[in-house]
UniProtKB/Swiss-Prot annotation:
GO CC annotations on file: cytoplasm; Holliday junction resolvase complex
Job description of the protein: The RuvA-RuvB-RuvC complex processes Holliday junction (HJ) DNA during genetic recombination and DNA repair, while the RuvA-RuvB complex plays an important role in the rescue of blocked DNA replication forks via replication fork reversal (RFR). RuvA specifically binds to HJ cruciform DNA, conferring on it an open structure. The RuvB hexamer acts as an ATP-dependent pump, pulling dsDNA into and through the RuvAB complex. RuvB forms 2 homohexamers on either side of HJ DNA bound by 1 or 2 RuvA tetramers; 4 subunits per hexamer contact DNA at a time.
Catalysed reaction equations from the record: ATP + H2O = ADP + phosphate + H(+)
Domain writeup: Has 3 domains, the large (RuvB-L) and small ATPase (RuvB-S) domains and the C-terminal head (RuvB-H) domain. The head domain binds DNA, while the ATPase domains jointly bind ATP, ADP or are empty depending on the state of the subunit in the translocation cycle. During a single DNA translocation step the structure of each domain remains the same, but their relative positions change.
The protein, known as: Holliday junction branch migration complex subunit RuvB
Lineage of source species: Bacteria, Bacillati, Bacillota, Bacilli, Lactobacillales
List of residues binding Mg(2+): T66
The species this protein was found in: Streptococcus pyogenes serotype M18 (strain MGAS8232)
Coiled-coil intervals: none
Coarse class of the protein's main subcellular location: cytoplasm
Amino acid sequence: MARILDNNVMGNEEFSDRTLRPQYLHEYIGQDKVKEQFAIFIEAAKRRDESLDHVLLFGPPGLGKTTMAFVIANELGVNLKQTSGPAVEKAGDLVAILNELEPGDILFIDEIHRMPMSVEEVLYSAMEDFYIDIMIGAGDTSRSIHLDLPPFTLIGATTRAGMLSNPLRARFGITGHMEYYQEKDLTEIVERTATIFEIKIDHEAARKLACRSRGTPRIANRLLKRVRDYAQIIGDGIITAQITDRALTMLDVDREGLNYIDQKILRTMIEMYQGGPVGLGTLSVNIAEERNTVEEMYEPYLIQKGFLMRTRTGRVATQKAYRHLGYPYQNT
């Protein structure tokens, strides 16, 4: 059941995400600090009739970075062209995209930290001075061509801002840190989604579902669909608090939003390593998960909720983790 709490987009969810996606800042639930800042920056750019400064959106998966990029484009009334770091394999791929931009357009690059360095370097002059120099030919016949670009806004999204090179990071004039959502905001998102898909759910059920969604709208919407299925087959189609509890228990999602893998990580640390410290590589081998999967998918939420600490000597399970899983805690 761990995939239910996977932050990555799955299968036909891309269509659902588009259906649920707010169009403007006033429709966007949560991320109040980021919204307040962007509202000012966007309005200032519009009054000056200028392109918005380049924007870097960073934070864990599923928190609305792509949605925010589309909202910014709608607020500015401009076109958005979308690609991703892994999709832009060669400098020529990026040059072709940049050459198609119209004045004021937004270029959105998801997973920008995964862009090859040779491609990234093309962005430096494009972002700073709106031009690129491209090499034509090879050997003695090669020559450089200067290509001017219209003013545009680059929006980069990343889950790993620390992997961006300093020259690239320095060229973003605006940064937006997308944080895990508060319970009240996630509850509102669940109720909004239920309204759009005509799902009957009471407020307490929506709150319970929000509490167990790891602070992530994408997970909240995914869980809502599975609880809807449960309510239709086991109940009368109406999602109540009791139905929600039963469905999420069936899905191995506990009251703190921890799934089977989360609990396996903590139990392994407590039972085999006396709570730690234990190295990430050793932990990954013991739970049969890839190192990057543990570090990017599971650890951030466990740390944010206070179940896990990163130290110089390794990962350590906290007293809260012991209590939550029913283990006696001894402070050694």
